[in-house]
Structure formats: C-alpha cells, structure tokens
Amino acid sequence: MRLMKLALAGVCALGLLSAGAANSAEPVKIRMAWVAPVANWASIILEKKDLALHMGKSYTLESARYQGTPQMITAIANNELEVSNLAYSSLAIAIENAGLDDVRVIADEFQDGVPGYYSSQFYVRKDSGINKVEDLKGKVVGTNGGGSAIDVAIRAMLHKHGLEEKRDYTMLEGPLPAMPAMLLEKKVDLIPAVLPFSFNPKLREEGRVLFEQREALGLTQMIMLTARKSFIDKNRAAMVDFTEDMLRIVHWYLDPKNHDEAAQIASKITKAPPERFGWLFTKADTYRDPDLMPNLEALQRNVDTTRELGFVKKQIDIKKYADLTLIQEAAKRLK
C-alpha cells in the first residue's frame, strides 16, 4: 500500500511538473508585415493592444515594414516573417517562383473595387498633357516594385490599351509615400496613389486621376494575411488566439463610434493632421471584411491576371492555398 501511495504521488508530481512546463512555455513570436501606414492592419494593430487578450500570453507580436509585398517573399522563405500581408500577385510569385507551396491565405486585409467603396487611383500632373492611357507611350511610370499588386494593376491597364513595358514605357521604382513627390517633381509621369497618400492636398491640387484600379482589374482581393502551413501546424493554438485578437481589434476600428479615436491613431502613425482621416473606415476607404474573410473567387481571377502578364507560368488553384479554419474558429469564440 505504501509503495502504491508513493507511486501515485510520483505520478501526480510528474503531472504537476508537466503542467508547470506547459504554462511556463515561451509565447510564440509572430512578426507581421505591412507596407502602407493605416491601410495595413499591422501598422495600427498594436495601438489597440489593450483589446488583445492573448497577446503576451500565448504569443507576442512585432510589426515590420517593407517597401512592397514582393520584398516579403525572401523574408518568408528565410523564416523571418510569420504573418505576411501578401498581395494577390506576390502570393502567386511566392507559390511558383519562390517555391513556397506551403504558404496559406488565412484572412482578408482589404479589397479594391467593391461597389460603393474606394478604388486605388493613378495620377498624372494636370499640366502633363496626358489625357488618356494611350498618352503614356514614351513616358515614365512609377511603381513600388515589380510584381506588387499596384504594379500588376498598372501593367494590366496599360496592356488593355496596347502599351507594354520597355517597348512603350519605362518603370521607375520608389516607395509609396514618395510617389506624390516623384510625380510633382517630374521624375515620373504616372503614379499609383494608394490610401492614405491619395489624399495628399498638394497631389490633389496639382494632379488628377487618369484611371482607377477597378477599371483595370474589377473587384480585387488586394491584400491577404498569409502564413506558412508548417508554422500554423506547429503553433495552431497561438495562431487562433492571434486571429481572435485581430478580429476583436478590427471590429473596434470598423465601429463608427470609434472613428475619431481611430483618426487620432492614424495621425500619430502618419504625422498628418487627424482631420485628413475623415475617410478612414468609411465607404471612402477600401472594403475591409469585418469577419476578415477573403474573397477567394476574386483572388482566383486576380492570380490568373498575374499569370496572363507573365509573372508566373502555371495555373494556380488558389483554394488549395487557403486555410480559413483559423478565422472561422476565432469567430466562433466571439459569438
């Protein structure tokens, strides 16, 4: 009997030690990418970390800025980035050209061209003499990087009008925040003006919209949150916690009653006056699904366009590269 009690005590002690080890496990480190301030969730998510109930417990979160989504691909391949906000184009490039066939779409970030919502604008100078797309022949076009979503949209629109890069126009790369200055200083003749830079007062005064992205691509699943399957499988519980916190914070930002505070946060991030952000999280903004559910049908069309423009060669069935179970499980917790 005494031996049995000792054995039971040993089993209990081992159980307590195991539980203690589990409870003391280090939180999973999540590095999350962004390109455009305010437009990308990672640039503002930590401003409302008080709503992230699991942050610091099951996971930690760091945000990292990149010039464009193509630059994230190397970081993903080197395991330097756990959650990336890839565009439809860079997703296709990552899958085929970089061999990242375990990358998975896990959530929506924003969509372009949804009826009634904002679509990215492409500006020329008012004094440029450029009145139609065909007038861009022989001109210099600004881009934030070959193969980015914006880059593909430009190429698609110019292709529709019979213009091809190198043969008919030249591309010049630069960061998105610098685009208005590049146009007004006559370094380029056309720029992509994404939010929030399209509301630059000087750009609006001296430039004009030549076309919108919806004219080139229709409805676009512009940016998605992605992660590698190997990372999801290894850290599923932490990823569901992260996604739950994301949903909670996104709901806060999208609630109209929080608009003024959201504008103050945007002002802090961009160093621009808060009154410039009246459009933020309204129909003057790009569409953001409140449940973070991506539009996979639109994404398939967008990936097909990327292939048609020569960035990838093979047909990609995008549903094979989506894992929406994280967002679905997280959403159930909030009901």
Map each language-model feature to its residues.
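Sec/Tat signal peptide C-region and signal peptidase I cleavage site
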Residues: 18-24
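Conserved C-terminal helix/tail region of periplasmic/extracytoplasmic solute-binding proteins
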Residues: 303-335
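Secondary-structure end/capping motifs
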Residues: 233-313
